[in-house]
Amino acid sequence: MYIKTLTVSDINRYIKKTLDNDFILGNCSVKGEVSNFKFHSSGHMYFSLKDKFSKINCIMFKSSVEKLNFMPGDGMKVIVKGRISLYEKEGVYQLYCSEMKPDGMGELYLAFEKLKIELEKKGLFDISHKKKIPLYAKKIGVITSPTGAAVKDIINVTRRRNKKIELLIYPSLVQGTGASDNIIKGIETFNSMEDVELIIIARGGGSIEELWCFNDEKLAEAVYSSKKPIITGVGHEIDYTIVDFVSDMRAPTPSAAAEIGVFSLEEYVQKILNYKNKLYNSVKNTVNDKKNRLAFVKKTLEVNNPLTYIANEYENIDKIKESLNFKIKVIINGKKEKLGKINALLSAHNPLNILNKGYCIIEDEQKNVISSIEELNKKYKVDIIMKDGTSKVELIHYKK
């Protein structure tokens, strides 16, 4: 019997055609527990559906995701509708989901929620207990698999940000039996080392089963009791474990944990330069301000200098003195002129001046001037005033 030789593409194409034309597989409803859930940046969702015995890979495209009224996650039981087809390039068959609805919670998810509630009641999640992450840790302890992608990411980020940082890698299991005990031992080891300032617990993405060791109660208590601050970077951004709630800081990925824990040398130097420039400008501004203030005070003192004030007042006094002297002279000259006129007038009318012409003045004993003969009959003695003296005479006879 002749058997035709087919290429891999021929086989995959034939299988895909067979699956696509199958009446049941072309439109089926499947229920199971979500595992290894990933929400891609494109908007598509990738996950597995599993039961006790099997699992199947699933994909839901963005157009169908946008119609969901809830966000699925690891451990959640769901019912999906879709079709079974083959991804020819990889030769992998998968369930292409068009609809999804919740169908309860899986056992692991319920166990996770139960432990989370218990530890929260014990206070292991209290924000007040969380230790401050050091800004400039020089030696960092890393607990992770020595061969996984997480340790490579952390080393690469550290080399990029600060080559002077010393990383101490504690090789540990990060999934399966004994993983949580390994991680606890790593925490104890780094706590015993005085120069270790920070601990990073890291692991790459995985299903809820693969990350389950990070939901261990003893590990949660070890993280809580650690004297050194701990950053957890477990799984992808959508993955949350118990240690993420207990740790002092949760990072969405191992790389992000390194970004948080390792300070950038370039940024550190730039910060110092910024502080230097800020200090220089502050001192410069202060000096300039003081100079301006000093110049203002100096100018103010020059204007308000007592000697300057006194000199100005002396100048004002001299001006006032000069003005007063001028006014006094004017007044005196005016008075002199007026007095001269009065004196001339008085001299012209002075009765004593007629004595120089040979006349005389007769006064009675009371110094009253006698100007009529009729006044003499009552007077017996009179004074005759001449230009060079006065003579007393006794009246003997008078003639009218």
UniProtKB/Swiss-Prot annotation:
Catalytic reaction equation(s): Exonucleolytic cleavage in either 5'- to 3'- or 3'- to 5'-direction to yield nucleoside 5'-phosphates
Main location class: cytoplasm
Keyword Cytoplasm appears in the UniProt entry: yes
Compartments in which it is found: Cytoplasm
Spans traversing the lipid bilayer: none
A Gene Ontology BP annotation from the UniProt entry: DNA catabolic process
Domain of life where this protein originates: Bacteria
A single GO molecular function term of this UniProt record: exodeoxyribonuclease VII activity
InterPro entries noted in UniProt: Exonuc_VII_L, Exonuc_VII_lsu_C, OB-fold_nuc-bd_dom
GO cellular component, one term: cytoplasm
Disulfide bonds: none
Quaternary structure (record): Heterooligomer composed of large and small subunits.
Family of the protein in this entry: Belongs to the XseA family.
HAMAP family attached to this UniProt entry: Exonuc_7_L (MF_00378)
Protein name: Exodeoxyribonuclease 7 large subunit
